Amino acid sequence: MPEPEYREDSDYVKSVKADAMFDSSRYEVKPINLERIPAMFSQRGLSNETVKDLAPFISLIRDKRNEKFDGYNIGFPYTNGKEETIKGYEIRGHGGYKSKAAGTDSTSSAWAADLSNGNEGLVKSVFFCESAFDAMAFYQMNKTQLGKDVALVSLGGTFSDKQIIGVMNRFPHARAYDCFDNDLAGRIYGLRMMALLEGVPMKINKKGDSLQVEAKGKPFELNTERSLLAQVSKHLSIRYKMGQWLPPKAFKDWNDCLMNKPMEVIHTPHKDERNQNLTERRKSGLKM
């Protein structure tokens, strides 16, 4: 599948490319003390109850080679579903710090919180987010509707076909859900995941605020403000292997939604207002 134009989270990507292989001996790892939950979670709107529910899938990690910082960060372990060996970590720290452990496998591994108590064959829904904090926020906001037959997944600011395939092979009876960000990159991630799960080769390119798509010899344009599933189904026969559970439109991602931090609205003047502004600028120019 051709690589479309989209951004990956540079902080995550830079850290992953620093080392070729993940070396677990480089990191000191310990579980979260539920009697002393790090304040970083509450600063992101995440409740103690949410942290306790997901604590089996979260660690505190310290990089022994980091001479500038000797403390612990929050680590979300990456696995590939084929073996129990940890393949790296998505890392979050104070001051907005985000990275990945050196050598983290972001090609075929991801953070996966399986809430089925290990009964992977019983998982019915897998919710894909761009970060672990987003996945935790999604869980907190929708917990009463989710049940225990679900899994939360973070791709950590990147998107790889092998990540998606590996996760869905791990949960063979589940339906994938696009919970990605409300931006162009998030829409492309969702579209790529749909194409992958439907088995439809797809070319995707940006065209202003829309997406130009070609699949099965058919070119068509998608409005990123509307449901991708509904639009694609008008042009292609799809099996609805993927669902969408996006953040509300006013918010960039699920964590911003939890924290009630809406995106800035760009004010577009009406025609009369634009004409008035133009007249005032011209008058100002004449005075000069």
Residues covered by each model-derived region:
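Basic, glycine-enriched DNA-binding surface that flanks or lies within the catalytic cores of DNA
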Residues: 8-105
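Generic alpha-helical structural element
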Residues: 26-32, 127, 182, 243
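Residues at alpha-helix termini
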Residues: 43-47, 140, 199
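Phosphate-handling DNA/RNA-contact segment within nucleic-acid enzymes
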Residues: 65-170
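TOPRIM fold recognition
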Residues: 144-288
